[in-house]
C-alpha cells in the first residue's frame, strides 16, 4: 500500500509541474501575444499590478492617487491574489491582467512576479518594480 501511495504522489507532483510549465511558458505568453496583436499600446496608460492583495500597497496607492490627480494618465489596476486563489479564479485574474498589460505603456509592481516575468513584454512597454530587494531577484522590462 505504501508503494502505491508513493507512486501516486510522485505522479501527481509531476502532473502539477507539467501543468505549471504549460501555464507559465505556453498559455500565458500565447494569450499575451494574441492580446498585443489585437490592441495597440496606449501611450498614457499605466497598469498597477498587485500580486497578493485586494488593494494596492501604500507606496503604489500613493503613486496611483498622484497620477490620478494629474489627469495625464489612464490608470488601470490588476490584482492577481497570488497564493490566495487557485485554478480558474487565478487564471481569470491573470487573463484580466494580460488584457490590461497588452495595451499599457508602463506596468508598476512592488514585488517579484512570476507571471510578468514569463511574458515577452513589448518593446514599448516598461516594467517598473518598486520592490527594494536585491537586483538578482528582479526582472525589469525594456
Give the predicted meaning of each segment:
Residues 1-44:
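Membrane-proximal basic amphipathic "stem/tether" segments
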Residues 45-142:
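Active-site and donor-binding regions of nucleotide-sugar-utilizing enzymes
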Amino acid at each position: 500500500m505504501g508503494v502505491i501511495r508513493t507512486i501516486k504522489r510522485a505522479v501527481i507532483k509531476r502532473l502539477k509541474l507539467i501543468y505549471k510549465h504549460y501555464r507559465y511558458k505556453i498559455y500565458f505568453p500565447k494569450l499575451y501575444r494574441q492580446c498585443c496583436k489585437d490592441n495597440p499600446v496606449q501611450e498614457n496608460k499605466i497598469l498597477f499590478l498587485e500580486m497578493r492583495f485586494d488593494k494596492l500597497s501604500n507606496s503604489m496607492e500613493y503613486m496611483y492617487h498622484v497620477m490620478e490627480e494629474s489627469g495625464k494618465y489612464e490608470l488601470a489596476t490588476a490584482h492577481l491574489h497570488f497564493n490566495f486563489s487557485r485554478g480558474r479564479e487565478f487564471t481569470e485574474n491573470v487573463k484580466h491582467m494580460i488584457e490590461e498589460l497588452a495595451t499599457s505603456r508602463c506596468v508598476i509592481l512592488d514585488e517579484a512576479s512570476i507571471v510578468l516575468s514569463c511574458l515577452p513584454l513589448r518593446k514599448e512597454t516598461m516594467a517598473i518594480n518598486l520592490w527594494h530587494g536585491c537586483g538578482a531577484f528582479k526582472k525589469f522590462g525594456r
